């Protein structure tokens, strides 16, 4: 098999892996916000799908109805994670350009 000069597929894969690893680090710094219950519960999630904060308005804290608060927290967190995944996929897509390279997996991305 003859390879043309200047084309080294392994070098290109390594460069792509390096770019994606840098992007993963950048995603840790990017955040999305999500809320439920008209803003009564709000969460901040980073691009690595890590929940950074949860805020609960005092008005929604009812000792007689804990289930409602739990449902609002779950809804806000799930919405935040979905938004974070969409953001991460969009950012990574800029680098990968839709490539599907076997073995090129970035932990915590998908």
From Swiss-Prot:
Name the UniProt record assigns to this protein: Nucleoid-associated protein Sfum_2790
Matches recorded under SUPFAM superfamilies: YbaB-like
Domain of life: Bacteria
Localization terms from the record: Cytoplasm, Nucleoid
Quaternary structure (record): Homodimer.
Organism: Syntrophobacter fumaroxidans (strain DSM 10017 / MPOB)
Record's function text: Binds to DNA and alters its conformation. May be involved in regulation of gene expression, nucleoid organization and DNA protection.
Chief place of localization: cytoplasm
Protein family (similarity comment): Belongs to the YbaB/EbfC family.
Record's GO cellular component terms: bacterial nucleoid; cytosol
One GO MF term attached to the UniProt entry: DNA binding
Entry-linked InterPro entries: YbaB-like_sf, YbaB/EbfC
Organism lineage: Bacteria, Pseudomonadati, Thermodesulfobacteriota, Syntrophobacteria, Syntrophobacterales
One Pfam family, short name: YbaB_DNA_bd
């Amino acid at each position: 098999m003859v390879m043309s000069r200047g084309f080294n597929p392994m070098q290109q894969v390594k460069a792509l892996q390096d770019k994606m690893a840098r992007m993963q680090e950048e995603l840790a710094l990017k955040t999305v916000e999500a809320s439920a219950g008209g803003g009564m519960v709000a969460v901040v999630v980073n691009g690595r799908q890590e929940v950074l904060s949860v805020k609960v308005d005092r008005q929604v804290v009812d000792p007689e109805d804990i289930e409602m608060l739990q449902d609002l927290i779950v809804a806000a967190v799930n919405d935040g994670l979905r938004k974070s995944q969409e953001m991460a996929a969009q950012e990574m897509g800029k680098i990968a350009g839709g490539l599907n390279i076997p073995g090129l997996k970035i932990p915590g991305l998908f």
